[in-house]
A protein has these predicted regions:
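Terminal RNA-binding accessory module
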Residues: 51-128
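Conserved C-terminal portion of the radical SAM core fold
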Residues: 1-47, 67-75
Length: 128
């Protein structure tokens, strides 16, 4: 129940109708997915997809990408809230960004903390 589950989604593939996109967005919204990686379809030479019609206008592809990124943000916020107060192991990276360091919990919640040399590349128990 505490797993962070992500999904990769491509928007704007040739032939994607408004109805297809709405059905996909509604399906994703109904699932216990924690976050999305949203990709906008782009043409690639020497692929069969170049022959599929109709081609989705790039502006509509970007609009659909934004809609799903907003959905992803909202899902991640809800997931983080559902983990509030839980103690999770966090792997902190060694990067010092303006006195801060970042890491990810074992269920993919991004954590920012004041930089501490002794935490570099270490797993620290952290209250979410």
């Amino acid at each position: 129940p505490h797993a962070g589950i992500g999904a990769d989604v491509i928007v704007g593939f040739p032939g994607e109708t408004d109805e297809h996109f709405a059905a996909s967005a509604n399906f994703i919204a109904s699932q216990d997915i924690s976050y999305l990686h949203v990709f906008t379809y782009s043409e690639r030479n020497n692929t069969q997809a170049l022959e599929i019609k109709p081609v989705i206008p790039i502006s509509l592809r970007h609009e659909r990408n934004k809609i799903l990124r907003t959905l992803s943000f909202n899902k991640m916020q809800a997931f983080m809230e559902s983990n509030a107060g839980a103690v999770r192991p966090v792997l902190f990276e060694s990067v010092n960004k303006n006195g801060m360091m970042e890491g990810y919990s074992d269920n993919y919640i991004k954590i920012a903390a004041p930089f501490r040399k002794e935490w570099e590349n270490s797993i620290v128990n952290w209250t979410i």
